[in-house]
Design a protein with these regions (language model features):
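Catalytic nucleophile-loop/oxyanion-hole region of alpha/beta-hydrolase
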Residues: 47-48, 68-103, 220-223
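N-terminal cap/lid segment of alpha/beta-hydrolase-fold proteins
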Residues: 1-30, 82
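Short beta-strand/loop motif that positions the catalytic acidic residue
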Residues: 161, 166-169, 173
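Short beta-strand element of the alpha/beta-hydrolase
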Residues: 31-40
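C-terminal catalytic histidine-bearing segment of alpha/beta-hydrolase fold enzymes
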Residues: 193-257
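Primarily recognizes the serine-hydrolase "nucleophile elbow" in alpha/beta-hydrolase
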Residues: 87-160
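Short amphipathic alpha-helix adjacent to the substrate-entry channel of hydrolases
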Residues: 48-66
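Conserved alpha/beta-hydrolase "acid-adjacent" motif
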Residues: 174-183, 226
Length: 342
């Protein structure tokens, strides 16, 4: 293993620590995935407890690990920290071959204030991570304004283009209220962004990897599981590193076609209903079938539509036992129409 410490901004004391593991030789692969660690500290400092221990946990899983000690203290004015992130991510991608990593498989993990920075990276950065792990992240106005007035509130910037997110928090966090994670989770759900969330019964704030030598308070015995769970989730999102290289991701990034540039039977009923009158005419076989079901079961058509609105057009047509040929014909017509998003 090699370690490098690169100064990104001497005036603001911004550094990037790189931990680079070997490839080839006894290993049968040439590139590893990478993780960029963003420690917390209220934008006043970067916590050591959320730096090396986190990097080492991901290195054990095969990752090249990087720790960004971004602008804090008197240099924390926004957008300095985000600019530090952009510079670090650009450097990691630029040196991907030298640092033996896959530039398309760089994730980021952030804690507290670093979780805020990580959430901003996932939502508004030019160089978004392939996936973002947000551990007790600062998201909402009260906590963000306390750390640094003028910073963005990440949940307000979530779109379909936001990086997939893994959220970790404890219900009894009295530093960053659990509503921060819940509101971020809701924004991700509303925009169709893949996510996984683990809210533990107790653990407070600042538990990092929750190993005994790191924490100084009581946490649920299950809190340390977030590390292995997040690594497992990254395998689903980016593919797994095996002795022979990477496997393909085994989770679809998009749950439906609502964010695609053109319409299809993969779009949800709720989304299709927002489209043009021309689209509604094409949906006549679906609407007729739903009216028949509503009449047979004593439901209102509006009530049935609301209940199944999250299902895709294909799922509903199949439930109505519409012939596959007709489904494909509808799909072909929809493919000729622009998706009006928003």
């Amino acid at each position: 293993m090699k370690q490098e410490i690169i100064t990104l901004n001497a005036e603001r004391n911004v550094t990037l620590t790189a931990y680079i593991q070997e490839t080839e030789g006894e290993f049968l692969f040439t590139k590893r995935p990478a993780i960029l660690v963003l420690p917390g500290g209220g934008y006043a400092m970067c916590s050591d407890r959320e730096a090396d221990p986190v990097a080492f946990a991901f290195m054990k899983a095969g990752y090249q690990a990087f720790i960004l000690r971004y602008s804090t203290g008197k240099h924390r004015a926004w957008p300095n920290p985000l600019e530090d992130y952009e510079q670090a991510m650009e450097l990691i991608k630029e040196k991907a071959d030298v640092w033996l990593l896959d530039a398309d498989r760089i994730a980021a993990v952030g804690f507290s204030a670093g979780g805020h920075l990580c959430a901003c990276a996932a939502t508004i950065a030019k160089n978004k991570p392939a996936a973002a792990i947000l551990v007790y992240p600062a998201i909402l106005k009260d906590i963000c304004d306390m750390c640094q007035p003028g910073m963005p509130y990440p949940h307000e910037h979530v779109t379909a283009a936001t990086s997939p997110c893994f959220l970790v928090a404890a219900r009894d966090d009295r530093t960053v209220d659990i509503k921060n994670s819940l509101m971020m989770q809701l924004a991700l759900a509303e925009n169709g962004v893949p996510f996984e969330s683990h809210i533990y019964s107790f653990g407070g704030h600042g538990f990092s990897t929750a190993e005994d030598h790191i924490i100084n308070s009581s946490v649920s015995d299950r809190v340390p599981n977030w590390v292995a769970d997040s690594i497992g989730w990254l395998k689903e999102m980016m593919g797994s590193l095996t002795a022979k290289g990477f496997t393909e991701p085994n989770m679809a990034v998009c749950l439906n076609g609502d964010s695609a540039p053109i319409l299809s039977v993969a779009c949800t009923l709720n989304h299709i209903r927002k489209q043009s009158d021309e689209v509604q005419v094409i949906m006549k076989p679906l609407y007729d079938g739903m009216e028949a079901v509503a009449a047979a079961r004593g439901y209102s058509v509006d009530g049935l539509s609301a209940a199944v609105g999250g299902n895709t057009v294909r799922e509903l047509l199949e439930m109505l036992q519409v012939n596959e040929t007709i489904i494909q014909d509808i799909d072909k017509v929809l493919h000729g129409m622009i998706n009006k998003i928003g």
